Amino acid sequence: MKKIILLACLLLTPLYLKADHHTIAGPGEGAFNTIMVQANDTAKYVDYLRANPELFKAVGAMAAGVCITRSGNDYEGQMLVWSTYPDLASAMHANTLYDPNDAPSALANLRTVKYGVSWKGLKSFRLDPGWERVLRVKVSPENLNAYVEALRELETAIINSGHESFNMGVFGPFGGGVHETQTLMVRAISPTARESGQIADEYFAGASWGPIWEKSRALIDKVVSDTYELCEQIYSAE
């Protein structure tokens, strides 16, 4: 817990990684980078990345993929490219190996780069992309430990209610600029949109875990954004 408090005070925050079902443990173990982009054609952009794995190999990524915003978009073609690393040092170093604004023309013509961020996880997290509700929230440092613990409790309760593939992560930015600074990113992940909707239906029907969700919400100072993303892994170093 002391590590989490220190991270919060430094405006840092955490990932436990699992590429093809590998798991990376809590604070300090594992990190990832994201590049937020506007794609002219999301399918063509993803196809290009999938066909050019050397882009991810060159920066030492353990795994990589994409998330396409399907609801709550700020702009058309909103998506991100993510890549995972064994530690934050490797993630930071990767930023020196590739400049997204100096990409080959074949790639540059497919998208406009918005910004990049490095992330750390505050709780264990299984990298198993799917249909993901993504909340960006602001939480006071004095409430951070309680908030993370509430999410752990909520994740366990939803899994035990019959959603065995459900997964939650809470992450904080390094180098978030005006876009992400002092903001936590929470991901609630289900295999499909239907199952995600079923979980929401169960909440409104009085699910036993409802009070835990409400407890976590009470610890949030502000919800910055609320989107749904369709995510997939397109590269693995193994």
Where are these regions (language model features)?
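Short S/T/G/P-rich N-terminal loop/turn motif that feeds into the first structured element of a domain
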Residues: 19-238
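C-terminal segment of classical bacterial N-terminal signal peptides
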Residues: 13-19
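Sec-dependent N-terminal signal peptides
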Residues: 4-13
